[in-house]
Amino acid sequence: YGVSVCISGSTGSGKTTLMSWLLSMVPNNRRLITIEEGSREFDLIKRDAEGHAINSVVHLLTRPSENPALDIDQDLLLERVLRKHPDVIGVGEMRSAKEALSVAESSRTGHTVVTTIHSNSAESTYRRMMTLAKRKYNMADEILMQIMVEAYPIVVFTKQLEDGSRRTMQIIEGEDYKDGELIFLSLIHI
């Protein structure tokens, strides 16, 4: 249905706000499932004048537990979501090695994924995802980078400026990763 997107930037740069807006643009006839950790920031259910939901949205939250058998983490929710035939999956933020690879693999299986990650630039976003995944998985850098480029063809980099405003600074399309070089097309650069 769509193209997977990773929105990157530092804390306070507007990643979640932009992601929420993008997800709000998903047509009402498409099934949207969000996964968030800790607290719910997305409210994407649209209602008619009588208060009835007019779109198909499911919001899910992780639930940590001291008992590992009762822990409901992002990875477990993502595994379950894939069986629910989503048109679009919104994953609040990639923070761990496990999440970085499992979210990427979901995108590579034909699901449209929108997610966020902390990084310093559009280009460094792919390397950030790769190094996050590398913490747990012993895979060659080249393979991990190719996975990330395939999983997220589009990277949007956001930044909070000195005056406090938040802006999209760059949008790139990752094309490939060969011989240690990210091959990408800069779609917008401010």
Set out the residue ranges of the language-model regions.
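Switch/coupling sub-region of P-loop NTPases
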Residues: 2-11, 21-149, 159-160
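Conserved lysine of the Walker
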Residues: 15
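Hydrophobic positions on the alpha1 helix immediately C-terminal to the Walker A/P-loop
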Residues: 18
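Phosphate-binding/switch region of NTP-binding enzymes
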Residues: 144-179
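Conserved small/polar residues in nucleotide/adenosyl-binding loops
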Residues: 188-190
